[in-house]
Structure formats: structure tokens, C-alpha cells
Amino acid sequence: MAMPRKLKNLNLFNDGNSYLGLVKSLTLPALGRKMEAYRGGGMNGPVKADLGFSDDGIQFEWMTGGLDLISLRQFGAVSANSVALRFSGPYQQDDTNEVSNVEVVVRGRHENIEMGDAQPGEDTEHSMTTTCSYYKLTVDGEEIIEIDLLNFVEKVNGVDMLEKHRTAMGI
């Protein structure tokens, strides 16, 4: 029997700026597929056809303590990949003491910034939702998943899932 790898700490970088001590929490992006049921003649039931990435897109939610001027200055960025965020965290397996370095890199722009409640003498925090056009998950230096929505790239476990599609489209 083995113990699971658990996140022991984390850091976030915003365009190369370390948020060590500033980042309070984050929600790593959910990855989803757009699937549509199909049932044709001779089929005893529906099978879902994969129609690409989910219409929900890639969302990165995160929270900082205090006033975050870097993010506020990035709000309204024109380019769909204006903001670069990098999560880095050690996941430790307590029975073996092994530590895995997990890194998630995203590029996008802030869809929402909530400045939270403001009360004298009380903690303040900002909550950000960054909608992403790029996502890459790396574990111990190995690229597990890379998704580049703007450049039609989707790699999973080293396999370029869209290579044949790009070739067929002449790109």
C-alpha cells in the first residue's frame, strides 16, 4: 500500500514576479472535452464523439493577500496570451519521502478581479479569474499535457494529438 502525493506548499509567479508570501490559494484549471452523443444504425447505444476542447475553456482562479498592483495593471490586456502565470509546488509522498515538482504554466488574460471587502483593521484580498489560451503541466521535468488553443496544439504524454489534423489542414 502507498500513500498519495500531497501538495506541501506552493508559489505563483505572475510574469516572472514571485508571489511567495502573497498568494493565498489557487484553483488549478479543470481540463474538459466537448463530447456529443452519437447513435447510428446498428449501434445498440450512443457513443460520445470527441469534438475538441470544452466550450468552458481553461480557467485559472487564484487569490492574493493585500493590494495586488501587478494584476490590476494587467486588467484589460488586449492579447489573449498577455499574462503569464506559473504555479510551482512540491507534492510529497509521506511513506517514501519522495517529492515531485509539479509546475503548471498558463498564458491568458484576467477575466475577473474581485477586490473583496474593505474594512479598517481587517485582512484584504484579491481574487482573480484568468481565462487561458495556453496550458502546460510538467511533473519532475516531464511534460504531461500541453494545450495551446491559439496554435492548435494539444500534446498528452508526449503524443501530439492534433498533428494529423494540422497536416490535413495544411498548417
Placement of each model-derived feature along the sequence:
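Solvent-exposed edge beta-strands and adjacent loop segments
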Residues: M1-L69, R109-A118, V159-A168
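A short, compositionally biased
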Residues: M3-K8, S82-R86, T131-S133
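A structural detector for beta-sheet-dominated domains
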Residues: F13-D15, P29, M63-G65, S88-P90, ...
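Short amphipathic beta-strand/extended segments with alternating polar/hydrophobic composition
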Residues: Y19-S25, E98-G108, E146-L149
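A mid-sequence interfacial segment
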Residues: E36-N44, Q93-C132
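A generic structural micro-feature
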Residues: G52-S54, A77-N81, S100, P120-T124
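A contiguous binding-surface segment within folded domains or other stable secondary-structure elements
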Residues: Q59-E111
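Mixed-charge, glycine-accented linear interaction segment located at domain edges/termini
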Residues: R109-I171
